[in-house]
């Protein structure tokens, strides 16, 4: 079942080059989408989509039982509580984790294609995204989200790992170098 996530914050995007998790497993494109807990309409739509997939995969009689058995297992469920993570921007949000072995569509606001060189989308910006939920049986039941596409929506405060230095952080040593050469 496909769901469109409108105006959600992007975290840990790997949209242009596939990666492995901790150097293991299949190479995939991936991203997390942060959803404020106050956006109950979107959260309920996501949960309904997940329950729909559970019903299709395992039958309608045990939907709530299966949902409840996997919803608190981060290895078996794509929608998670951001309060359990110590990452920038996660507190007060749920996050939906999605991945795909195939490269997702990545477009700008005007639907033109984006590349890594464009610098958008980036971790911390706001995007629209489409995902598709699917159920699986692999040493137990689970529901994951396949990443289909991401559209840059608007700028946001970038999540960074410390950032890059600016020129203002350094002294101009050009005169000092000349003085050292003259003194020797």
From Swiss-Prot:
<protein>
    <recommendedName>
        <fullName>Putative protein p50</fullName>
    </recommendedName>
</protein>
<dbReference type="InterPro" id="IPR022595">
    <property type="entry name" value="Enc34_ssDNA-bd"/>
</dbReference>
<dbReference type="Pfam" id="PF10991">
    <property type="entry name" value="Enc34_ssDNA-bd"/>
</dbReference>
<dbReference type="InterPro" id="IPR012340">
    <property type="entry name" value="NA-bd_OB-fold"/>
</dbReference>
């Amino acid at each position: 079942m496909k769901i469109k996530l409108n105006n959600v914050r992007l975290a840990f995007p790997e949209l242009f080059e596939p990666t492995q998790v901790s150097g293991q497993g299949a190479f995939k494109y991936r991203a997390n989408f942060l959803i404020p807990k106050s956006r109950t309409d979107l959260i309920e739509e996501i949960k309904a989509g997940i329950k729909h997939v559970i019903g299709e995969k395992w039958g309608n009689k045990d939907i709530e039982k299966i949902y409840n058995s996997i919803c608190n297992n981060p290895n078996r469920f794509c929608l998670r509580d951001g309060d359990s993570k110590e990452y920038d921007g996660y507190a007060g949000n749920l996050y939906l984790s999605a991945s795909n072995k195939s490269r997702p569509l990545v477009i700008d606001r005007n639907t033109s294609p984006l590349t890594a060189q464009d610098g958008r989308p980036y971790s911390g910006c706001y995007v629209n995204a489409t995902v598709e939920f699917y159920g699986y049986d692999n040493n137990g039941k689970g529901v994951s989200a396949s990443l289909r596409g991401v559209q840059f929506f608007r700028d946001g405060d970038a999540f960074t790992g410390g950032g890059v230095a600016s020129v203002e952080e350094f002294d101009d040593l050009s005169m000092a170098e000349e003085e050292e050469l003259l003194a020797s």
